[in-house]
Amino acid sequence: MTVKSPDIQSLVEGLGHARVALAGDVMLDRFVYGHVERISPEAPIPVLRVDEERAMPGGAGNVARNLAALGAEVTFLSAVGDDEAGADLKAALEREGGIEAALTVVPGRTTTQKTRFVAMSQQILRADRETTQPLDAASAERLLAALTSALKDRQVLVLSDYGKGVLTPAFARGAIAAARAAGIPVIVDPKGRDYSLYAGASVVTPNRKELGEATGAAVDTDEEIVAAARALMKAHDIGAVVVTRAQAGMSVITADGAVTHLKAEAREVFDVSGAGDTVVSTLAAALGTGLTLAEAAGLANSAAGIVVGKVGTAVVHQDELLAKLRERELSMLEAKVAGLKSAEDIVAGWRARGLTVGFTNGCFDLLHPGHVTLLERSRALCDRLVVGLNSDASVSRLKGPERPVQPDIARATVLAALASVDLVVIFEEDTPEALIKALRPDILVKGGDYTIDKIVGADFVQAHGGRVEIVDIVPGFSTTGTLARLKG
């Protein structure tokens, strides 16, 4: 997803307006942190000297935490046992803030706990206490009634299935039916092989392994993943599949045939605990505020890249996501400024996809409305617009020794920030003729009162089947005039 400032801040802050209903398997995540200095004399195992212990809501509880961290309003429904872990979970959720938790207490049920022992940022052991028994019918009915009531003022429903028995077949199907009746999209983080439980869901978010298990198909390549996802959608009336692929990123496949592959954005991976929770929560908040699935997946991919760089069952806050998106935008701006060889490769790729390539050029020293209008009108004539930019030496030869005011890298960065510009190439010559011959644009655009025979490169473009367009410029704006007024 491409987001331009200042839209980034309003987009991220907009996640705080999402109203989400969440149901699923809650569990207590305990982390025992320490260090290892020796091997036990009793057995060939490390001895962990404990320094710190932490406990926090996990499973669907971590989805709730992530939603709250993004600023969303969350109604969370689940079931716990009448045990110490259940009481600890209720207290932990109350401390979180922003989560309206409705936990059904089921006598005799074991609350799931996962205890991870960690030394030097590495897990050395995990110990589980859990039940996978389906919730009894009476408790499931109470939970479904509470969820149906909660949907009245929610924008999206999330079902977080960890296979611990809360999402019984009857509950899952009833929840999806209630949401569809209310016109609310349903996102499912699935578990197991039987996706008939999720029939009618808007989006399911399996990881690559889960997708393979659910379909019995190979899922090693992009093509195999797309084929498996399409089979899943067709079999169970699912609207879209978002496949999380660890270091390979994410794939988004929709029932209307659209496919998007997103590269992973993590720089360092310390712990993947709960990364899927971050993905589903970001998707939910984004869809709840009206973003498209492709846009929501882009945000979720960025959020996942943040959370795997943390230790433990972690969350992503609004300010972290905002910083990540701004960092990515700067990287994208840099990527839009290319040398000649890179530009040739990029243009060849566009042309292979059947895209029309346009070209215009100039000094663009102090960007003004005339420049902006020229670029917008040029971009309207093509699918991709390349801007040839005179280098500092070239500008000095053309405009005089006091020009340019801004160096070429600064001018290129400003141009790259415009949505109308797809690529900027700096050239050293006085004219862009060599650049035009190298890139062979389909459309050559010039602003002003030129005639075609006076436009550099026009004959070459026309000889190769292209066309030349002259667009009107906005009168009253020029860099030279602006500088003259400043000198007064």
Swiss-Prot record:
Disulfide bonds: none annotated. ATP binds at residues 207-210. This is Bifunctional protein HldE. InterPro entries: Bifunc_HldE, Carboh/pur_kinase_PfkB_CS, Cyt_trans-like, PfkB_dom, RfaE_dom_I, RfaE_dom_II, Ribokinase-like, Rossmann-like_a/b/a_fold. Its EC number is 2.7.1.167, 2.7.7.70. Gene3D superfamilies: 3.40.1190.20, HUPs. Catalyzes the ADP transfer from ATP to D-glycero-beta-D-manno-heptose 1-phosphate, yielding ADP-D-glycero-beta-D-manno-heptose. It comes from Parvibaculum lavamentivorans (strain DS-1 / DSM 13023 / NCIMB 13966). The gene is hldE. It catalyses: D-glycero-beta-D-manno-heptose 7-phosphate + ATP = D-glycero-beta-D-manno-heptose 1,7-bisphosphate + ADP + H(+); D-glycero-beta-D-manno-heptose 1-phosphate + ATP + H(+) = ADP-D-glycero-beta-D-manno-heptose + diphosphate. Keywords: ATP-binding, Carbohydrate metabolism, Kinase, Multifunctional enzyme, Nucleotide-binding, Nucleotidyltransferase, Transferase. It comes from the Bacteria. PROSITE patterns: PFKB_KINASES_1. The lineage of its organism: Bacteria, Pseudomonadati, Pseudomonadota, Alphaproteobacteria, Hyphomicrobiales. The keyword Transferase applies. Pfam families: CTP_transf_like, PfkB.
